[in-house]
Structures are given as C-alpha cells and as structure tokens.
C-alpha cells in the first residue's frame, strides 16, 4: 500500500503514505512520508521524517521527531527527541528528553539532559540538567541543576535550583540553593540555607537556617530562625531576631526585635525598639 514503502523485517508493515520504511521486526509505519522504524516493535502512526530507532519506540505524528530510547514516545510536534528509557515528549518543538522516564509536555527548546523521573510541563528553554524526581511546570529559562532530588519550579523566568527538596513558585531570577528552601515569588531573591523562606519582594536574602523574609526590598535575614516581615534595607543578623517592617533597621543580637521605623538598632540580647527613628536598644532586655 502507498507509494515506495518498504517493510524489510519479519512481521513488519508499511501500510500507507510514501517513502516509509519498517526495518525493525514487528514494526509498523501506518502512513505519512519518509518515516522509519528500526527497532523491534516500533510504531510510527504518521507525519513526516520521523524515526523510531529503538525497541518499542513510538512516534504518533508531527515532523522530524525521533524516539530513540527503548519504550520511548513522541506524540507530535516538530524536531523533538525522546532518547531516554521510557521517556516521553508529548509535543511542542525542539524538546529533548535524555533521562530515564523523563517527560516533557510541550513548549519550545526544553531539555531534560539526564537523571530519572523528571518532568518539564512546558514553557521555553527550561532545563533539568540531571536531577531526579524534579519538576519545572513552565516559564522561561528556568534551571534545576544536576544531582538535585525532588525540587520544583512552578513558573516565572530565570530561576535556579541547586538543592534537594527546594521550591520556587514564580517571579524572576530567584535562586534556591539549599535543601528545603522556598521562594514563593518576587525578583532576584536568594534562599541560601536549610529551611529558608522568602515569600516575595526584590533582592531579599535568607542566608541562615530557618530564616524568613516576607517581602520588601533588599532585606537580609542572616540569623538562625530570624524573621523580616517587609520594608527596605533591614538586617536581622542573629538567632531569632525580628524586624517587622520599616527601613534600614538592624536587629543584631539574639532575640532582638525592631517593630518598624527608620534606622533603628536593637543590639542587646532580648532588646526591642518599637518604632520611630534613630533609636538604639543596646542593653540586655532593654
């Protein structure tokens, strides 16, 4: 059937289209043009210039797609490659899955370069470079680094995760670099120790274990379990120190608190500044 089709292996079939070749045993090309199956049990349903080159690989359609991993599948689209074991590219264009059991749903120029059980749902130029059980739901130019386990980027752009169990919800250019760190959104925020959290804002840093920044601009929570609610240019640098809001406030001893205001400093242990400007509480429990 069809025109210039070839079935060259046992129980193979090229049943429609033109210039198709079923070269693997028990392989099938149903239609389309210039499609080729080379592995045992390979299937190409249609489309053009598609290749199923490993055992039980499948290409459903589209143009210039390649399923080269054992049990791999490409649903459609253009120039997609599924080369990992049981890997899948559902659609889109120029997507590549090299890792085992990896899945790319669609989008453009997304890559899972190695690792196991990783997913990129869609988006543009997202990359998983070798983690395991990690997910990029969408967005643009997001990256999960190699050796990472079970981390997630939900969306946004230019995010980087390089630690296990880390999460970035969205925003732009956020970095979660330690295990169990979380950035919900915002721009250019960095969560760089275990269990750190940044909810949003711009250029905020949580750099000690269990430190939290709620939002604001250029705030730094660098003490263990320290907290900054918001404001600008505030620093909570010791364990359990708290700055609720304001600008240019400093809580620089354990359990020190600044509730708000401008350029206030709580430098004594258990000290507190309620608000105002240029106030200093330097004594213990002052």
Locate predicted features.
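Periodic small-residue-enriched repeat registers in elongated scaffold domains
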Residues: 1-286
């Amino acid at each position: 059937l069809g025109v210039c089709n070839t079935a060259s292996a046992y129980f193979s079939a090229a049943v429609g289209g033109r210039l198709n070749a079923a070269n693997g045993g028990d392989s099938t090309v149903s239609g389309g043009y210039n499609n080729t199956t080379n592995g045992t049990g390979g299937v190409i349903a249609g489309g053009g210039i598609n290749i199923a080159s490993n055992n039980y690989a499948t290409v459903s359609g589209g143009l210039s797609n390649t399923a080269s991993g054992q049990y791999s599948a490409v649903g459609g689209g253009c120039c997609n490659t599924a080369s990992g074991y049981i890997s899948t590219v559902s659609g889109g264009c120029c997507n590549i899955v090299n890792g085992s059991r990896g899945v790319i749903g669609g989008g453009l120029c997304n890559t899972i370069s190695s690792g196991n059980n990783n997913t990129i749902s869609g988006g543009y130029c997202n990359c998983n470079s070798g983690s395991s059980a990690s997910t990029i739901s969408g967005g643009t130019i997001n990256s999960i680094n190699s050796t990472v386990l079970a981390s997630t980027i939900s969306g946004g752009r230019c995010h980087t995760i390089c630690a296990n169990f880390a999460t970035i919800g969205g925003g732009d250019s956020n970095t979660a670099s330690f295990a169990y760190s979380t950035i919900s959104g915002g721009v250019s925020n960095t969560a760089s120790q275990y269990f750190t959290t940044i909810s949003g804002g711009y250029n905020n840093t949580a750099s000690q274990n269990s430190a939290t920044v709620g939002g604001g601009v250029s705030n730094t929570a660098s003490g263990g379990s320290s907290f900054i609610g918001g404001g600008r240019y505030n620093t909570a640098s010791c364990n359990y120190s708290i700055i609720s809001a304001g600008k240019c406030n400093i809580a620089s001893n354990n359990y020190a608190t600044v509730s708000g205001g401008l350029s206030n400093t709580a430098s004594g242990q258990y000290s507190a500044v309620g608000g105002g400007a240029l106030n200093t509480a330097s004594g213990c429990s002052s």
